[in-house]
């Protein structure tokens, strides 16, 4: 086994899920807002490179999974909720954007 993330103090990474291609995973993190409960979805290659933020909702986004063909992403979020504890399930087309490195 190997470690993919090495986050600073106050950052939590959890709920990883493999893309069907097994080239990368999606997971939930508060990397952008350490010590907060603001969790967004991130994507990282299996070698630990190319970290990319996927969601931007200033709330809680987690428990992401892909459809078998990898074209749909499903996750839990409190976006559009009346309170921070109102969670719903969201589905979106997953479009992989190549980095310009």
Residue positions per predicted region:
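Sequence signature of WD/YWTD-type beta-propeller architectures
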Residues: 1-101
């Amino acid at each position: 086994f190997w470690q993919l993330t090495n986050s600073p103090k106050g950052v939590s990474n959890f709920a990883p899920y493999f893309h069907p291609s097994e080239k990368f995973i999606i997971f939930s993190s508060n990397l952008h807002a350490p010590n907060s409960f603001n969790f967004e979805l991130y994507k990282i290659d299996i070698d630990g490179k190319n970290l990319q933020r996927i969601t931007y909702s200033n709330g809680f986004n987690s428990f992401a999974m892909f459809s078998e063909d990898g074209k749909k992403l499903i996750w839990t979020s409190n976006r559009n909720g009346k309170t921070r504890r109102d969670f719903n399930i969201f589905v979106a087309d997953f479009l992989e954007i190549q980095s310009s490195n």
